[in-house]
Swiss-Prot record:
Keywords: Aminoacyl-tRNA synthetase, ATP-binding, Cytoplasm, Ligase, Metal-binding, Nucleotide-binding, Protein biosynthesis, RNA-binding, tRNA-binding, Zinc. Zn(2+) binds at H564, H568, C676, H680. Binds 1 zinc ion per subunit. Its main location: cytoplasm. GO terms for molecular function: alanine-tRNA ligase activity; aminoacyl-tRNA deacylase activity; ATP binding; tRNA binding; zinc ion binding. Its cofactor is Zn(2+). Catalyzes the attachment of alanine to tRNA(Ala) in a two-step reaction: alanine is first activated by ATP to form Ala-AMP and then transferred to the acceptor end of tRNA(Ala). Also edits incorrectly charged Ser-tRNA(Ala) and Gly-tRNA(Ala) via its editing domain. It catalyses: tRNA(Ala) + L-alanine + ATP = L-alanyl-tRNA(Ala) + AMP + diphosphate. This is Alanine--tRNA ligase. One of its GO terms (biological process) is alanyl-tRNA aminoacylation. The keyword Aminoacyl-tRNA synthetase applies.
């Protein structure tokens, strides 16, 4: 059968047989293009290769690239589920030539694959070429034998590809499949081209020009090829279906959601099942590549995708959490092709489960607030965009959910007002942000790399070396010399200074020549391995080509080494304690401390933290040798080395192994084995001691620990001991008894607070100390007891109101408590005999409006609310009593 997995492997095997390097998919977060939200095409990772900024050992490549289009310029989110071919996640099959073969081979490879390997009928295929690309048209006639009618010339930009306003560009040739005259639509270039009969399945881009400016375009001396074929589209063709969602992969996912929910994918429910299947793929792959749901950037797009799927699960009537239960089905279909899914399975499941649990609460709360804010609106009205933004910003209720909920009532959202509120918030955020100040563009570093070559790093073996200055940069410009007092950057042909990367900060130290001393404050790695020494000339003048001596601050480096090695031990300790779903999400290694971010869906208990710390320190006490090896990537992974999700590695990697396997079970020899380019201790004992000082949340599903090592850890613990002794002195007890003494004092305080609170309740019920409003009054024939009380906790107000209801027998009771920070909390009770005519929820909302609150909630007999303006408590009670007067 032409399954999705078979089609993918057939494509890659075909081009491998034809001399192409088969490369793994790049991460969904582009490595070298900050202008892109997500990788959305096969050529994204090769942009610098096409422009000449990067070079590889191969000049032919083929990939199955995972892509996401759900944010920024390329955004298919709103169409997904309602059309046959829109997806948030898709796979792009491609073959690439970097100044190797050109049009003839590209056309031959494509035609041969489609007609010989995939066995498509020639009669079902037609192609387009750019209107003046006579070469491509002639090659199609020669290779395929297609008639002139089936080689269509297109004059629009659809058949001319550009990377940007400038850069490589060239004409395209698109291959179309004819689904037959039973489906409406005409061939490309015709009046009916928007129909679904003729579907593009492959695009060949002939990069033969370079756009220098809007008016000037020149021929490239060595043209290249970039092609892209959507796997889902070609699968639909080869499986004889017209709709991408009818291919085997989607049929399996949709069948699973139908079975779990118990609702068939028909009628009004058809689109919802398709949305869930598509969004499951994008959510799982984004999480596996290190994206976590959040309220900004890529994390916000992921959250929108997840919540859109979860909303459709809600529309289908799913009573239980759904998305995480579909993960095993997805992995059974795609895990072999994408092993990162298998490695991240538990994390994907936990994040989906956590997010869907939160979303259900958000959905319930958001719909309640939305209904309250829109009760006065009628069909055809506009909902206030500022309020819609507040629902999003404060309560996490996305705009698309607000629009969907109101659309059923014929109400639109003022999107312009929403956008203005969003822009205002972003402007305020930008005003509070300051950049790095580095005005040198990446192009400068690549230019230096091309002129003088990469910097040779010597820092693994030594902290002192000699070299020659190859470049000097001052104020963003390449210069020939730098003078006394000037801040600048120095590039040397070789260096022992480590350039900041992999979370490890750059080295500092001294670069000196015959006529100058340069103090290095930081070292960065730019472009393609160009090491930049950043600092200031302290004496003399430095010139290009000067011979220099480079000396790293060894004391600082020693602390950094200890902290970096400690992160590896803590990483493995976390996995041993919490589970294999723990993977690194970020780190910061400085001489003062270390910070380690990792995937985990909940906070870590003190007992777990102690175990994590103890495990790591057990390896420190082993004082075992830390081993560094250069290995083939496949061998390293086979040995158990941990690779980071979202990272792309070369064929040869540096592997750091440390510690003996404590369990002495299985094939794993080492305690920790990771791919890493940082600097490390020689023996684990050099770390001295590891002490975790904090554990916090960074984002949904991401936790952070901070720790100290060696002398810093010892001094920290000494400080803790000193504080315990000082506290013991204040409490007049021994350090060993401090905890017991503090617990006794806390128990006594709680007892006194309870007695005080009980006394305040009694006073309130008896009419005292409540601003003279605690007596029972009669308003419009209704008994009323109410007042303003001080320092009664909001949670105790309900008990106070219940007591008041018993005291008056029939009527309304309302108490407002004002806290020390000026906030007001209110509870209103209505006795059972009056709930047919009076509603406590309506009454408490009158109080809430006066207190500056958002409304309230509860039952007809008991409701609560609050507000920030507790000073208006008396005014709020007056408003309530006025409402009872009628």
């Amino acid at each position: 059968m032409n399954s999705v997995n078979n089609i993918r492997s057939t494509f890659l095997d075909y081009f491998h047989r034809n001399g192409h390097e088969v490369l793994s998919s790049s991460p969904l977060v582009p490595r070298n293009d900050p202008t892109l939200m997500f990788t959305n095409a096969g050529m994204v990772d090769f942009k610098n290769v096409f422009t000449g900024l990067e070079k590889h050992s191969y000049n032919r490549a083929t990939t199955a690239q995972k892509c996401v289009r759900a944010g920024g310029k390329h955004n298919d989110l709103d169409n997904v589920g309602y059309t046959a071919r829109h997806h948030t996640f898709f796979e792009m099959l491609g073959n690439f030539s970097f100044s190797n073969y050109f049009k003839e081979e590209a056309i031959f490879y494509a035609w041969n694959l489609l007609t010989k390997e995939f066995c498509l009928s020639k009669d079902k295929l037609l192609v387009t070429v750019y209107h003046d690309d006579d070469v491509a048209a002639g090659l199609w006639r020669k290779i395929s034998g297609l008639s002139e009618e089936k080689i269509i010339r297109i004059a629009t930009n659809d058949n001319f590809w550009m990377m940007g306003d400038t850069g490589p560009c060239g004409p395209c040739s698109e291959i179309f499949y004819d689904h037959g005259d039973k489906i409406w639509g005409g061939p490309p270039g015709s009046a009916d081209e928007d129909g679904d009969r003729f579907i593009e399945i492959w695009n060949l881009v002939f990069m033969q020009y370079e756009q220098l400016s809007k008016e000037k375009r020149i021929e490239l001396p060595q043209p290249s090829i970039d092609t892209g074929m959507g796997l889902e589209r070609i699968a639909a063709v080869l499986q004889g279906v017209h709709d991408n969602y009818d291919i085997d992969l989607f049929r399996t996912l949709i069948h699973a959601s139908q079975e779990i929910i118990g609702v068939k994918a028909t009628g009004d429910f058809f689109a919802s099942h398709r949305v869930i299947a598509d969004h499951l793929r994008s959510s799982a792959f984004l999480i596996a590549d290190g994206i976590m749901p959040s309220n900004e950037g890529r994390g916000y797009v992921l959250r929108r995708i997840m919540r859109r799927a979860m909303r459709h699960a809600h529309l289908l009537g799913s009573k239980d959490l759904l998305m995480w239960r579909l993960v095993p089905v997805l992995i059974s279909e795609m895990g072999q092709a994408y092993p990162e899914l298998v490695r991240a399975e538990s994390l994907i499941s936990e994040i989906l489960k956590l997010e869907e649990t939160r979303f259900r609460k958000t959905l319930e709360r958001g719909l309640g607030l939305l209904n309250e804010a829109s009760t006065h609106l009628e069909e055809g009205d506009y909902f206030n965009g500022e309020v819609a933004f507040k629902l999003y910003d404060t309560y996490g209720f996305p705009l698309d959910l607000t629009q969907d909920a109101l659309r059923r009532r014929g109400i639109s959202v003022d999107v312009d007002a929403f956008d203005k509120a969003m822009k205002r918030q972003k402007a305020e955020a930008r005003a509070n942000w300051s950049g790095s100040g580095d005005c040198v563009t990446e192009t400068v570093w690549f230019s230096i790399r091309d002129q003088v070559g990469a910097t040779e790093f010597l820092g693994y073996e030594t902290e002192k070396a000699e070299g020659i200055i190859t470049a000097l940069i001052r104020d963003g410009e390449v210069v020939d010399h730098i003078d006394l007092g000037q801040k600048a950057m120095i590039v040397v042909n070789q260096t022992p200074f480590y350039g900041e990367s992999g979370g490890q900060v750059g080295d500092s130290g001294i670069i000196s020549g015959a006529n100058f001393i340069f103090e290095v404050h930081d070292t960065q790695k730019k472009g393609d391995n160009v090491f930049i020494h950043i600092g200031e000339i302290k004496t003399g003048q430095a010139k290009k080509h000067d011979c220099v001596e480079l000396i790293v601050d060894s004391a600082r480096r020693r602390k950094i080494r200890a902290n970096h090695s400690a992160t590896h031990l803590l990483h493995e300790s976390l996995r041993q304690t919490l589970g294999s779903h723990v993977v690194q999400k970020g780190s910061f290694v400085s001489p003062d401390r270390l910070r380690f971010d990792f995937s985990h869906p909940k906070s870590i208990s003190s007992e777990e933290l102690k175990k994590i710390e103890d495990l790591a320190n057990d390896i420190v006490l082993q004082n075992s040798k830390v081993t560094t090896r250069l290995m083939a990537i496949d061998d390293a992974i086979a040995e158990g080395a941990m690779a980071l999700f979202g990272e792309k590695y070369g064929d040869e990697v540096r592997v750091i192994s440390m510690g003996n396997n404590l369990e002495q079970t299985g094939s794993k020899k080492w305690w920790s084995i990771e791919l890493c380019g940082g600097t490390h201790v020689q023996r684990t004992g050099d770390i001295g001691l590891i002490h975790i000082i904090s554990e916090t949340s960074v984002a949904a599903g991401v936790r952070r620990i901070e720790a100290l090592t060696a002398t810093a850890a010892r001094l920290y613990l000494h400080g803790q001991d000193r504080r315990v002794y000082e506290i013991a002195g204040l409490l007049k007890t021994s350090p060993a008894d401090v905890q017991e003494r503090v617990q006794t004092l806390l128990d006594e305080r709680r007892k006194l607070e309870k007695e005080l609170n009980d006394s305040r309740k009694k006073i309130a019920l008896n009419g005292g100390s409540v601003n003279s409003q605690g007596d029972i009054q009669t308003i419009n024939g209704i008994s009323f007891m109410g007042g303003v009380v001080s320092n009664i906790l909001p949670k105790d107000l309900k008990a106070l109101v219940d007591s008041g209801k018993k005291k008056i027998g029939s009527g309304v009771v309302a108490f407002i408590s004002v806290s020390e920070d000026g906030k007001g909390s209110a509870v209103v009770g209505v006795t059972d005999d009056l709930t047919d005519t009076l509603n406590a929820v309506d009454l408490v909302r009158i109080i809430s409006v006066t207190l500056g609150g958002q409304g309230g909630g509860g039952r007809r007999d008991m409701a609560q609310a609050g507000g920030s303006e507790g000073g208006k408590a008396d005014e709020a009670l007056v408003a309530l009593k006025d409402s009872l007067k009628g």
